[in-house]
Swiss-Prot record:
Pathway: Purine metabolism; IMP biosynthesis via de novo pathway; 5-formamido-1-(5-phospho-D-ribosyl)imidazole-4-carboxamide from 5-amino-1-(5-phospho-D-ribosyl)imidazole-4-carboxamide (10-formyl THF route): step 1/1; Purine metabolism; IMP biosynthesis via de novo pathway; IMP from 5-formamido-1-(5-phospho-D-ribosyl)imidazole-4-carboxamide: step 1/1. Belongs to the PurH family. The keyword Cell cycle does not apply. GO terms for molecular function: IMP cyclohydrolase activity; phosphoribosylaminoimidazolecarboxamide formyltransferase activity. It catalyses: (6R)-10-formyltetrahydrofolate + 5-amino-1-(5-phospho-beta-D-ribosyl)imidazole-4-carboxamide = 5-formamido-1-(5-phospho-D-ribosyl)imidazole-4-carboxamide + (6S)-5,6,7,8-tetrahydrofolate; IMP + H2O = 5-formamido-1-(5-phospho-D-ribosyl)imidazole-4-carboxamide. Keywords: Hydrolase, Multifunctional enzyme, Purine biosynthesis, Transferase. SUPFAM superfamilies: Cytidine deaminase-like, Methylglyoxal synthase-like. The IMP cyclohydrolase activity resides in the N-terminal region. It comes from the Bacteria. This is Bifunctional purine biosynthesis protein PurH. Its EC number is 2.1.2.3, 3.5.4.10. One of its GO terms (cellular component) is cytosol.
Length: 538
């Protein structure tokens, strides 16, 4: 049976007479304490916060003086006391609560300013197990939750960004806060503790290799509110989880306006793809539109990689996202600004390149500070009606697979390189995906079709259009390798690929009709390998 409320009406304005300040992040805390002192508010504090306030010459009382109990166990126990929690939780207009406060010498606390041990930062920095556990805050969340529950009477501040609004209200209302403000701060407080606990629970699951915990909570901190979502009638916001994986959520915006919902989604897809190519081995460029690649290439230089990626489908690249695996240089920047582009993301940007990009002030330029590790473990999540689908990140790499030649003809060394290149790209194309590649360059990409044959045909059509635009006698699919991200269920898909000019095929295998497909390949002298790994993407 649920706990029954006494339904005592909450007052609109509550005067702040006593405040408890206990923070790890001391940004603005002395200034806040000064403002409270000027309003005649009694200050209570703990540990380092107490020292900072006292050092500023402000009158402050250590919490241990009102509890009559010292801080013990290396600070693990300092505010977990009835005097503190009674002062936060007491319903001021309840006679029974008032009597209990008098009986036990409990004073009301009207304001709590609390923030937490930096568990997220310690986890992100890869702290060892004991250090990470030690940075799990106990007293802080308890006080936050107690204060937020009793927001009818208590104001809770958990974010230094709210101090200015609070002090303005305090000055304007004669040292009082409004109920609407207290409600809003309470909602924010519970969101903060929920996100904090989510990070802790997910860290434990990761540390203990628990793949399917009984409860899975994914938390995030608001990074920005957006003008709209995927479409103008949808509301949207961008939340960051605290994971330090280089990419769109951690990158610095060097120029350009705020990224849109679609910009963020597409930029993430682009950067995750280009990270498949080691920068120390070769420069690479990926051009993305609607989260699908329209051109990917490597080259002897970054500018050559860009030109080759653009050549695959220069029409679709218009208004796209460009991702690079090396520092953006001036020569590449000069080429990029010739085309209307939404976003460029790279590990770094030279000063010369910045000056060139600045000629296009609406072009968003992101410096990610590094590349994400495509082999790193992690989670992805997708919402469905009433649920959340959570899975491990697709970190399978074709270089790590044992490829099985299943045809009479084995691929040449060049065909094998092209196969691996195409399969890398196919991993990042919406299913059904077919990718033709030749000499480290996509020749044609077919994405998102219900029929794999249609994806193969679209990819071939794109190659034909590119050949016309470039003045080539034949499409680049002639003599190419082709990748399918999932098995070929029938020989018709293979025959379509052969008709486009492919000489080698890479696919996961695993169809009931694998032998039928193999026989068709042998009949046409095609080399085919199985990877044993599928890369569906939806």
């Amino acid at each position: 049976m649920a706990v029954i409320s006494k339904k005592i009406p909450a007052p609109d304005k509550v005067e702040i007479k006593t405040a408890l300040l206990s923070v790890f992040d001391k940004t603005g805390i002395v200034e806040l304490a000064q403002a409270l002192s000027e309003q005649g508010v009694r200050l209570l504090s703990t540990g380092g916060t107490y020292k900072a306030i006292a050092a500023a010459g402000l009158a402050v009382t250590d919490v241990s003086e009102i509890t009559g109990f010292p801080e013990i166990m290396d600070g693990r126990v300092k505010t977990l006391h009835p005097t503190v929690h009674g002062g936060l939780l007491a319903i001021r207009d309840d006679s029974e609560h008032q009597e209990a406060m008098k009986t036990h010498g409990i004073e009301a606390i009207d304001l709590a300013v609390i923030n937490l041990y930096p568990f997220e930062d310690v986890r992100a920095a890869g702290g060892d197990y004991p250090t990470t556990v030690e940075n799990i805050d106990i007293g802080g969340p308890a006080m936050i939750r107690a204060s937020a529950k009793n927001h009818a009477y208590v104001t809770i501040l958990t974010d230094p960004n709210d101090y200015a609004e609070f002090t303005e209200q305090l000055s304007a209302d004669g040292g009082k806060t409004a109920y609407a403000f207290r409600q809003r701060m309470a909602a924010k407080a519970y969101a903060r503790t929920a996100a904090y606990d989510a990070v802790i629970s997910n860290w434990f699951a990761e540390a203990l290799s628990i793949d399917t915990p009984r409860h899975r909570v994914i938390g995030g901190a608001l990074k920005e509110e957006m003008r709209y979502g995927e479409n103008p009638h949808q509301k949207a916001a961008f939340y960051v989880t605290g994971e330090k994986r280089p990419g769109v959520s951690t990158a610095a915006l060097l120029q350009g306006k705020q990224l849109s919902y679609n910009n963020i989604n597409d930029t993430d897809a682009a950067y995750e793809l280009v990270a498949e190519f080691l920068p120390e081995k070769e420069p690479a460029c990926a051009i993305i539109k609607h989260a699908n690649p329209c051109g990917v290439a490597t080259g002897s230089s970054l500018v050559e990689a860009y030109r080759r990626a653009l050549a695959c489908d220069s029409v679709s690249a218009f208004g796209g996202i460009i991702a690079l695996n090396r520092t953006l240089d001036a020569e590449t920047a000069e080429e990029i600004v010739k085309l209307f582009t939404e976003v460029i993301i790279a590990p770094d940007v030279t000063e010369e390149a910045k000056a060139i990009i600045a000629r296009k002030p609406n072009l968003r330029l992101l410096s990610a500070g590094g590349l994400p590790d495509p082999r790193a473990a992690g989670l992805t999540a997708k919402t469905v009606s009433g649920g959340l689908l959570v899975q491990s990140r697709d970190n399978g790499m074709v270089e790590d697979l044992e490829l099985k030649v299943v045809t009479k003809r084995a691929p040449t060394a060049q065909e094998l390189d092209d196969m691996k290149f195409a399969f890398k790209i196919g991993k990042h194309v919406k299913s059904n995906a077919v990718v033709y590649a030749k000499d480290g360059q996509t020749a044609g990409i077919g994405a998102g079709q219900m029929s794999r044959v249609d994806s193969a045909r679209i990819a071939a059509l794109k190659a034909e259009e590119a050949a016309k635009a470039l003045g080539l006698a034949v499409p680049m699919t002639h003599g190419s390798a082709v990748a399918s991200e999932a098995f070929l269920p029938f020989a018709d898909g293979l025959l379509s690929m052969i008709a486009a000019g492919a000489t080698a095929v890479i696919q996961p295998g695993g169809s009931m009709r694998d032998q039928e497909v193999i026989d068709a390949a042998d009949e046409h002298g095609i080399a085919m390998v199985f990877t044993g790994m599928r890369h569906f993407r939806h």
